[in-house]
Amino acid sequence: MYSLIRPLLMRMDAERSHEFSLAWMDRLARLGLGRLLCGHRLPDMPRRVMGLTFANPVGLAAGLDKNGEHLEALGHVGFGFIEVGTVTPRPQPGNPEPRLFRLPAHEAIINRMGFNNQGVDALVQRLRVTRYQGVLGVNIGKNKDTPTERATDDYLSCLQKVYPYADYVAVNVSSPNTPGLRDLQGGELLEALLGRLTHLRGVLAREYGRYVPLVVKIAPDMDEAQRAHFCQQVLRYGIDGVAATNTTLSRDGVEDDPLAREQGGLSGAPLRPRAQAVLEELGQRLGHRVPLIGVGGIMSGADAQARMAAGADLLQIYSGFIYRGPLLLEELLKAVAPEH
């Protein structure tokens, strides 16, 4: 069904197209036609990672359902897990429009959304009543007007509020669209953030009687020394997983596109080699001590196989889902099935 409406979606403004697609999916789900959102029957491929059981290893990355408004509809697609957010302590509108650009010739997207979301309290209200039964990740960040030196307070506030409802929490310190955010990926700022988050997680685990894993999502634009320090701190503080990678500021592979001059993070096919290389390095540095989530530029079954070979335990898609729809999920799962 996605192939029938894709030409229309590609002619629409990118942000309106995403909104229309989600509304259309919601309507099908409400009418009891959610089965139409999935391709053929998907293989049963349960995975045990971070103490959680995933129906299959391919999930939806954060960014598509920022406020947890579409979980039931997206749940029909067949993802092994869904990550909502990024959510911040207070609502914020994000950056001015236009802020989302498709580069179809390159199967790429440039976004400078800026963590537009309704705030963590609105998300929690929805998570309390959701009928979605799969593994749920919540991606948390800081408000734009929060000074970098106080950013940790924003993450702690979000963690405390989403903890009872999240199966895991993803800490977003790598979006290029919030000033100063990437400073949190290294040095004393990273150490303070991870130290305080893991301490609070321990307190909350005792309070609620359940352990919620922490995943940190990193940028593809760090240098080797920064990645080495990051891995040291991940091991030091017992972080449960690393998602590699977020979008890139590089324009490698799209230099000839008129939209390449737009500010923001680049995702999709051009991100593939950079995200693959970072994942391979993390796999070597962390070994099997920390689970890895491969994300960024996964557009085909071959891409999925390459990420798994590099050490990924799980995969996430976003741009590939925008361009290929649910059929991509089917292709990825077939590619990483045990018989392959």
Swiss-Prot record:
The keyword Metal-binding does not apply. Pathway: Pyrimidine metabolism; UMP biosynthesis via de novo pathway; orotate from (S)-dihydroorotate (quinone route): step 1/1. Binds 1 FMN per subunit. Its EC number is 1.3.5.2. Its main location: membrane. FMN binds at residues 62-66, 86, 139, 172, 217, 245, 268, 297, 318-319. CDD domains: DHOD_2_like. The keyword Kinase does not apply. It is a peripheral membrane protein. The active site is at 175 (nucleophile). It catalyses: (S)-dihydroorotate + a quinone = orotate + a quinol. Belongs to the dihydroorotate dehydrogenase family. Type 2 subfamily. This is Dihydroorotate dehydrogenase (quinone). It comes from Alkalilimnicola ehrlichii (strain ATCC BAA-1101 / DSM 17681 / MLHE-1).
